[in-house]
């Protein structure tokens, strides 16, 4: 039995993250609310973890070891977080916003990405632990 809710949750969450991000840019939420960026990275990490778990359930038949699933999910979250931070750094360099302050921000972003991934993994792992693995 495959948990059909994973794909549904992942699609709904990515749509919500996209709407929140576009709204934040247009309404300057990232400037007005300093915590908003952390929330968005948490949700982004959560979404990546959902997508990774969906991939595992649909394409990897041997997934019984929860530690291997956890490592896979967190590595996916970190990989996407690092790619996003490289993108952000490139954009900041392109528009000439730079400085050492971007390093602590990048570290904070990666921490919140990872926290979102961990929370998503724990929730999904708990909801699916009684399902039969195919």
What residue ranges belong to the model's regions?
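Bulky hydrophobic segments
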Residues: 1-104, 114-134
């Amino acid at each position: 039995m495959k948990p059909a809710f994973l794909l549904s949750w992942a699609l709904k969450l990515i749509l919500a993250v996209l709407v929140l991000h576009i709204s934040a840019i247009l309404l300057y939420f990232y400037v007005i609310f300093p915590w908003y960026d952390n929330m968005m990275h948490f949700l982004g990490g959560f979404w990546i973890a959902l997508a990774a778990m969906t991939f595992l359930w649909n394409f990897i038949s041997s997934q019984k070891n929860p530690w291997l699933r956890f490592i896979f999910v967190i590595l996916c979250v970190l990989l996407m977080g690092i790619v996003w931070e490289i993108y952000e750094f490139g954009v900041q360099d392109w528009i000439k916003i730079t400085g050492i302050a971007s390093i602590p921000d990048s570290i904070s972003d990666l921490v919140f990405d990872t926290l979102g991934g961990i929370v998503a993994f724990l929730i999904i792992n708990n909801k699916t632990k009684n399902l039969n693995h195919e």
